[in-house]
Every structure is written in C-alpha cells, then in structure tokens.
Amino acid sequence: MTMLFSITLPALLGLSLAACTSTPEGSGIVAATGPTEQPKAQKTVENSNDGIYAKIKTNKGMITIKLEYEKAPMTVANFVGLAEGKVKNTAKAEGLPYFDGIVFHRVIPDFMIQGGDPTATGSGGPGYAFADEIHPDLKHTRPGTMSMANAGPATNGSQFFITHKETPWLDGKHAVFGYVTEGQDVVNAIVMGDKMEQVTIERVGKAAKAWDAMKVLADNKDKFRAK
C-alpha cells in the first residue's frame, strides 16, 4: 500500500538542529531439598534481538540501528516507509528507496552526523512535515542515538542525525527513534560528503514482522502536513 500525500516541495525545512547551537543475570541454581518436581512451563519471551533494524550501508562501512517502533511508531514508520520506497514524496519517484545515494551533508566532530536531505543543502526534504513524537523513555543518553533533525516544533521530514556522544540538551526538542547496535566506529569515521549507498530494513521476530508501517502512517495522517 502506498501512503499518499498531496504535497509540494517545502519552502522551509532547514533542519539544522535548533538546539545544537548551544554546543551533542545469569541465573542461579538452587538445590532441591524435597522430592524432585517437574519443571513448570515457562512463558515464551521475545528474544532480545527481536526488533526492526535499519541497515545503513555507507562508503565507510555498515551502521546498524535498532528502531524503537513501539515507543516512536509514527517516526519509525516514516523512516521505514521512505527507506522502502512506499511513501510518496517530492524528492524521488514513487517506489524508489528514498535514502539510497543521499550524503551526510552536516558533520560536527564529537557531536553528530546528519543526513536524509536529498538536496544535500540542509533545507531539503520529502515535501511534507509531521508532528514531534517525544517519548519519555527515549533520550539522547549515549553515543549512537538516532533522532530527527528539525527546524522547530512539528517540522520533521526525512533528515535525521546520529550522535557521537550523549547530548542531553536535545531531550524534548528532537524525537529519538533508534540506537546504534553495531557500527558506532563507522558513525565516528563519517565526514561531510560521505554517502549512504543503501538503506535497508530488517525485521526480526513475530511482532516486528507483523508491524505495518503504512497502517501506522494512515492512522496518523492528521499529524502530517504539506510543505
């Protein structure tokens, strides 16, 4: 299913991190003291590796990010939909993966790398903007935090950044939607102009495979507007 937006190219989507100018058990075994009992049935729990992952193949190597689709469903759905070419936008033809070939247009050492702008100018985007989705459990508390770049409230589009370090001053201002699980060394090696050669989405586990990004976007269409 294709998510349809009636949109025009945004006049303003500078997305320059408004707040950034302020400078980013093991289990024990207890011996039985009575008659041996049959073990009780265990509840099935999800594998800790289950989830939705963004695999960003760059010219410097691979970055793997676990996307927080349960806590930031709308933001993750937007990223996934664009990455898989399912969201209609003004930058690329329908069906084409949005992020493939886009460069990291802004890099601040010991702070963050920023990409997702098809024009590489810092003002480009998909032709629409959507509301901030700030979850209290998702904070800029560690290196490898993936968060939305914006030009103020409700101006999210396609630009995102990944941090080199903890950046708590961005909490509440930028929507966190994932964390790097592999490839932080690649994040740290990226310089301005390095390219996202391919961005793919990997779903691991039953819940992740059943999650429908396009349905999430359809359910939240009132939070999107043309730009």
What residue ranges belong to the model's regions?
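Bacterial N-terminal signal peptides
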Residues: 6-18
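Bacterial N-terminal signal peptides that target proteins for export
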Residues: 1-8, 146
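Cyclophilin-like peptidyl-prolyl cis-trans isomerases
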Residues: 20-227
